């Protein structure tokens, strides 16, 4: 039913056309007739269909079809015995006019059924036409995509194959709608892909687009935008140019492009006349863009004529083709007198040479006398005609194998079989190709030609003239020689930019607004982050740092104090001097072990005390050493133990003095546990308390090493022992108790007689120690963020603690031993008056309360020496 309605509509339309004015038609007789549809004229104004003669896309392409038919008809190997004719019409570059003209192609089919059979009248006779319309075997054309789409919709109803030489709309690849259409050119999505790759090559990510109204421009720009999105290229604004736009309207389009100053590149998918008007408007407005144009512009001089300045620097695309020298010779030999078969040639001649046949001033002109520019798609016109001829040749061989004439099987030609079995399967070497090129004509399963494009730039040559320069090609991939592009050569400076946002620095990522992949803010990564991708900063993690390129992370070297560091030299020097001094004191005491000063000092406790002081100095080396499990164990064990050895010995000393004189004042018996063995036992018991604490600490918190990074200095990884500062100071709490008790006893015995002024020196030692510790603790906590300062503070504090003991307690004794040896002898004196009364009172009280009497005596005016105090 739908086909009948369409047929009725066509009949009515045909009748209306038949009643109109006579039209020009180029007709060549032949056994098989091919239709031709060419834009002989440009578009007319609003009140007329046709405008001026279109020299390149109209006359040249039409003559290319005639040239190809002449060669085929003379070829003894291609359709021998069969002559091809032609029925060529003018589309006037307009789809509606082309559809009216194309009704000529189906007139003969109207007298046949859809299967090719002729209509039978009620009386049994075949229907006939009064003017005997020519049966069209196939159609070559049209040129513009919107023309081909309209004509293809008509021809498919009558199963007439169609091969276009220039229509590139992607819509025409849809075989469900255009099932009798083929073309020798590729579809626009290949061209769109090539244009998108050019933009990506130059890093143009923010562009404007202009498309012609109609299928060519609209479907082409849609395909481009699809390819652009796949490459993260954004469209700033999309404009359209219409068929009947005024100069002011084109200027409005240019102003709209100027509203997006960041988009310096404009992509054109326009017909040649639209591109010409757009360039002219840009020239008038003094607007400058970098144009990237489709094959609608191509390499046509007519597009840029008069607007060369506005077009300079443009990149244009054109289907890869080669000029046919035989056609050039053929075309230049034509004139109105030897080419009367072309009804439009006289009109072309008058327009080309600005002459008039009425005035008879056209005979003096010749095409050989003027520059000739072969239109870029001449090759595709010739290939289209040859493709139809090869398909008919193969069909003739299959259906008429025994004759060179047409047989009944091809009267009429079955268009469906011709297209499906022969046109789509045709394959041959392109005619008239240069000897050094290989160009095969064939169609894919969609009826499309194979895609290859030449890429040009429009530049100003050294002579000041403008010209097109081929700079590359696209054949499933882009190849460009940028040295041929003036603004892209290495000596030209930075490339023209067309982007919404500037590229982010190496240490920055993009913060993109939703839906805007080309416009972003640059957000710097943190120093400890690397770029996971262009949108994300990722944390390297503690102990790691981003590499120079910010593509990944590397493990930071572990920092600890080396022996050669300035932070180590000072503490180690102090420790070495202190250790040597301690060994020297020990040596002096051992050498003078039996002298009164050494004996009166309490030799056993002095040696223990010297051992503790030596341990204090040794702790510096343990704290400076590279942390390891063994070193960390020694740090925990050694620090508290060194202090406990010192302060346990001092506490034992001060406690003994306090008990002795406390008992003397009260007249008590001799105090218990004041013998050397008892004193050593008490001291060791006090030391063992610290050892128990340390062992418990080691069990609860196993020693080891760990990496430590301060939040504010993550680029520094410190190798440290795994204990907490609080744990370390907690382990010293026992020593704080010893110091407090020792200081208390030293304070209580501060008023002892001068013979017992060792208590005074112990007091000095403890007071100084308290000051050191009160200064050390806050410094230790405050400097916890800098392991070097903290370690140095610890080492110096421990060494100072040992030095105070060494200086306050042992220096006076050493002075007597070395420089006042006369005082280091045993002599007996009477009690001094200051001590006598106290001794008497102590003696009196002791006599009343105990069986034995404890009476201290004075030796050398300094120390108490008797059977019970000889070891002080």
UniProtKB/Swiss-Prot annotation:
Residues 677-685 are annotated as: Important for interaction with HTR2A. One of its GO terms (cellular component) is plasma membrane. It is found in: Cell membrane; Synapse; Cell projection, Dendrite. Keywords: Cell membrane, Cell projection, Disulfide bond, G-protein coupled receptor, Glycoprotein, Membrane, Receptor, Signal, Synapse, Transducer, Transmembrane, Transmembrane helix. Disulfide bonds join 50-92, 234-518, 355-362, 400-407, 500-519, 504-522, 525-537, 540-553, 632-721. PANTHER family: METABOTROPIC GLUTAMATE RECEPTOR. Belongs to the G-protein coupled receptor 3 family. This is Metabotropic glutamate receptor 2.
